[in-house]
Amino acid sequence: MAVLEIIKHPNEVLETPCERVINFDKKLVKLLKDMHETMLIADGVGLAAPQVGVSLQVAVVDVDDDTGKIELINPSILEKRGEQVGPEGCLSFPGLYGEVERADYIKVRAQNRRGKVFLLEAEGFLARAIQHEIDHLHGVLFTSKVTRYYEENELE
């Protein structure tokens, strides 16, 4: 496994919709492993492929709960319910945090590393993290959804 360079904003790859994955091969498995390692070392809870310079619909999420590591390939949100408002940051925007409104519950359809389709339901912080990463895959940055930015001392 290797630690990948995290792309910082501004960079065109972060604002470009990603291609769907069609090849479920060893290259994809390596990308998933490297992304997860990179995310953990950077102390993140999610990482999308464009954040490491790869324009594919691939994301990893690990909010350090009982769910563990989630690999999302070609994900789409089928259902949203409720509302939550809270702080978000992004590994591509070091030191920047803002208040973002997200659905409190989501149902997602995605594929695993072998191409098998699965459904996932999430709520609370996990739902927030998944929505943030899926946005990345469509070239949408959290800064476009921020209602207000936090000062550094507000999140201590």
UniProtKB/Swiss-Prot annotation:
Name of the top EC class for this enzyme: hydrolase
Location of the active site: E133
Cofactor binding mode and count: Binds 1 Fe(2+) ion.
Keyword list, A-Z: Hydrolase, Iron, Metal-binding, Protein biosynthesis
Superkingdom: Bacteria
A Pfam family hit: Pep_deformylase
Annotated CDD domains: Pep_deformylase
GO molecular function: metal ion binding; peptide deformylase activity
Catalytic activity: N-terminal N-formyl-L-methionyl-[peptide] + H2O = N-terminal L-methionyl-[peptide] + formate
Residues noted as binding Fe cation in the record, renumbered to the chain: C90, H132, H136
GO biological process, alphabetically ordered: co-translational protein modification; translation
Gene3D superfamilies from the UniProt entry: Peptide deformylase
Cofactor requirement: Fe(2+)
Record-listed E.C. numbers: 3.5.1.88
Record-linked InterPro entries: Peptide_deformylase (IPR023635), Peptide_deformylase_sf (IPR036821)
NCBIfam families found in the cross-reference section: pept_deformyl, PRK00150.1-3
Function text: Removes the formyl group from the N-terminal Met of newly synthesized proteins. Requires at least a dipeptide for an efficient rate of reaction. N-terminal L-methionine is a prerequisite for activity but the enzyme has broad specificity at other positions.
Family as reported in the entry's similarity comment: Belongs to the polypeptide deformylase family.
Name under which the protein is recorded: Peptide deformylase 1
Organism: Bacillus cereus (strain ATCC 14579 / DSM 31 / CCUG 7414 / JCM 2152 / NBRC 15305 / NCIMB 9373 / NCTC 2599 / NRRL B-3711)
Organism placement in taxonomy: Bacteria, Bacillati, Bacillota, Bacilli, Bacillales
Gene: def1
